[in-house]
């Protein structure tokens, strides 16, 4: 399974392969034309309540991961979105195409896309 993450503000490239925006909200200042997205499954993003509580605070990262995993495992629409994305990743991998999770957060370490990539690989 070949999954990487990349900021929405970084230029798209052919090496990104299948580009999936995993934020609930569209990244500010990014045009839809320049985003070059193949998919935008909003149900993979943390809920508004969880995102508001977390605020990308590194001190809350551990608790955020626990709560985010609970949402991915327990919300029917998230479960369906995870299954659909895993199937797409498997098909892409079979054809030698990478899947890139696109996110808008500033920090490449403190963001839900990194956690989601790990979750999808399990």
Task: Give the positions of each predicted feature.
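Residues lining hydrophobic/aromatic ligand-binding pockets adjacent to catalytic sites
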Residues: 1-122
């Amino acid at each position: 399974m070949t999954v990487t993450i990349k900021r929405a503000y970084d230029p798209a490239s052919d090496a990104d392969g299948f580009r999936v925006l995993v934020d609930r909200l569209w990244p500010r200042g990014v045009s839809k034309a320049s985003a070059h997205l193949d998919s935008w499954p909003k149900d993979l993003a943390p809920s508004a309540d969880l995102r508001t509580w977390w605020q990308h605070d590194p001190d809350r990262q551990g608790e955020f991961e626990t709560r985010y995993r609970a949402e991915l495992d327990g919300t029917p629409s998230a479960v369906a979105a995870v299954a659909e994305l895993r199937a797409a990743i498997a098909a892409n991998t079979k054809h030698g195409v990478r899947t890139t999770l696109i996110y808008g957060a500033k920090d490449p370490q403190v963001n839900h896309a990194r956690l989601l990539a790990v979750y999808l690989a399990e």
